[in-house]
Amino acid sequence: MSVRPFESPPPYRPDEFKPNHYAPSNDMYGGEMHVRPMLSQPAYSFYPEDEILHFYKWTSPPGVIRILSMLVIVMCIAVFACVASTLAWDRAYGTGIFGGSMNYPYGSGFGSYGGGFGGYGYGYGYGYGGYTDPRAAKGFLLAMAAFCFIASLVIFVTSVIRSGMSRTRRYYLIVIIVSAILGIMVFIATIVYIMGVNPTAQASGSMYGSQIYTICSQFYTPGGTGLYVDQYLYHYCVVDPQEAIAIVLGFMIIVAFALIIVFAVKTRRKMDRYDKSNILWDKEHIYDEQPPNVEEWVKNVSAGTQDMPPPPSDYAERVDSPMAYSSNGKVNGKRSYPDSLYKSPPLVPEVAQEIPLTLSVDDFRQPRYSSNDNLETPSKRTPTKGKAGKAKRTDPDHYETDYTTGGESCDELEEDWLREYPPITSDQQRQLYKRNFDAGLQEYKSLLAELDEVNKELSRLDRELDDYREESEEYMAAADEYNRLKQVKGSADYKSKKNYCKQLKSKLSHIKRMVGDYDRRKT
């Protein structure tokens, strides 16, 4: 169910030149126009409330969030491995096991800063007066990788096991907030890590910059290292490949969290726009995937021909009884429509009787209507909404299947409209088509507004039921109203109106195409 209005044909405005809507007569412009071909839309092109969202697929917004969370988990493990592989050099600095070799380069240049760096891990942190400690930067990035790993694992697990919590708007709001916080923190941790593992980046412009460059210059100039290379000093001055990979993965994690936020917002919008009965969280197998048994089918056909179906006139009488419902569900009088516009051809008895069913009748049970248009239900329905915060599918009795027109296809409708509205041959005929278009458009809009009011009310009640506590008075009242509107929406009157709207749309599209063809012929 959609809260947005049904799709409407564009208004007829001959004073505006819009090639994708209407091509006005060439006489209005006094010049030559180049108009794109205008194609008529099919009668049943798109109705939002008939759209089904398959959220169980990996290509849907929730499925993309699952994929991104899985990628974040893998990248967090890779960041942890890359950063942890370089911790050994920092541990050696802190213990001062190479104190003899370290004191020579540092003692000569920085003897007055920190006592000659007896312990290198602490010397540059305190003796330099505020440089970023590589161990602190690496610890910060490791901590953020751990937090991101835990958060992404929770998101992935709750989505894969299809828990009730992961099917609510509140869940995706939490995902948005957590992803935003973690993305910002990972960005800060990555910047700090870059400063920690690259001493020349933080030394530029400081009072100790020249000393840092002097120490590390031997590793930046080719052939200047000599025979002896201090491995610990080398890893301090040069960014290791593992550290570079960790930096790249840090920015990739930020991008992944940004995409998670985008798809979480899209999921919330779709959940606000569509009813829960239009969202499939689990893949449902309606038909059994079994090879056809021709022998059994012949037996069923021969055995089933003994029973006579109800007369076709009874079927037509049940369908052709339109009544106008208001938004509150009360009957406000009858409204007659032309029988030729929405009347369905009678159901062929042989076809209806000879088709074998592989499922039980209860799986396709629909509300029944008597000849006097009163709704008959097998039993009194209880509220079909679940607990607040849980996304529970509506009772299958309430599912609405699209109202069909029997054997009348779009091509047959087009032939009918072509007989009623043949190609235009004169300007007077064009003006007549314009008046018919305007009158039909007004009726189309008013009827769609009446149907859309029921859809909006259902969507509002659907959101309210998620906020109420089950078994409360507000919940029961809202559930009763929700079920009543679902019955109204499943009634034959609502479906006949909906079918009439679709055929009106086909009529308006045909008129628009005829006018467009006439205008193109005149150019």
Swiss-Prot record:
Residues 415-523 form the OCEL domain. One of its GO terms (molecular function) is protein domain specific binding. Its main location: membrane. Residues 1-66, 162-173, 266-523 are cytoplasmic. One of its GO terms (cellular component) is lysosomal membrane. Residues 60-269 form the MARVEL domain. InterPro entries: ELL/occludin (IPR031176), Marvel (IPR008253), Occludin (IPR002958), Occludin_ELL (IPR010844). Residues 433-489 form a coiled coil. It comes from the Eukaryota. The modification Phosphothreonine is found at T305, T404, T405. Dephosphorylated by PTPRJ. It is found in: Cell membrane; Cell junction, Tight junction. The modification Phosphotyrosine is found at Y369, Y399, Y403. Interacts with TJP1/ZO1. Interacts with VAPA. Interacts with CLDN1, CLDN6, CLDN9, CLDN11, CLDN12 and CLDN17. Interacts with PLSCR1. Interacts with LSR, ILDR1 and ILDR2. Interacts with TJP2/ZO2. Belongs to the ELL/occludin family. The C-terminal is cytoplasmic and is important for interaction with ZO-1. Sufficient for the tight junction localization. Involved in the regulation of the permeability barrier function of the tight junction. This is Occludin. It comes from Rattus norvegicus (Rat).
